[in-house]
């Protein structure tokens, strides 16, 4: 996946930190979240919404699956309205799940199923839509893998047909260009 996976969108600090989906103690440091999930990141001063903490705070039994993080991205585009030029700001939530524990292509089969992807994405997107009607969700769930062995993992991901229109494997270094 080239580094243009985000289509010109960039992390929106203000919108993320003001998101109505946040509940107590769910706005967390991105690098700390990556570390908790078994990875390492040099990204600093970036806060994301911990979807696992939100899910756990709801007290739903059985506990549903969720994506690991959500955050808001935005991009501005210039357009002409008659003789006037205007700027349009577009925003959306990104949902990502860290898969740093998948260290070899064979583990793609053991650690990720289509049902897992669907369950994580469906719960997370329905929660966000229920709390924030002003900013839409991206319709793609991003699964973030370590840069090591990424090509082999991505090939297995594609052959397993996990790279559906609703999910996409992205290597960590490409994912982090959004910040």
Describe these PLM feature segments.
Residues 1-65, 73-78:
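Acidic-basic catalytic patches of nuclease active cores, encompassing PD-(D/E)XK
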Residues 101-152:
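Catalytic cores of nucleic-acid endonucleases
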């Amino acid at each position: 996946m080239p580094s243009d996976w985000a289509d010109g969108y960039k992390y929106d600090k203000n919108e993320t930190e003001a998101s109505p989906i946040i509940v107590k103690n769910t706005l967390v440091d991105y690098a700390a979240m990556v570390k908790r999930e078994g990875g390492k990141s040099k990204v600093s001063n970036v806060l994301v919404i911990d979807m696992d903490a939100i899910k756990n705070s709801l007290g739903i039994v059985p506990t549903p699956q969720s994506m690991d993080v959500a955050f808001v991205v935005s991009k501005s585009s210039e357009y002409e309205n008659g003789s006037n030029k205007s700027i349009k700001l577009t925003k959306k939530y990104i949902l990502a799940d860290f898969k740093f524990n998948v260290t070899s292509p064979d583990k793609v089969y053991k650690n990720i199923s289509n049902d897992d992807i669907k369950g994580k994405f469906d719960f997370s997107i329905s929660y966000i839509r229920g709390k924030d009607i002003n900013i839409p969700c991206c319709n793609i769930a991003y699964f973030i893998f370590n840069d090591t062995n990424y090509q082999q993992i991505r090939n297995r991901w594609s052959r397993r047909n996990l790279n559906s229109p609703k999910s996409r494997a992205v290597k960590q270094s490409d994912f982090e260009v959004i910040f």
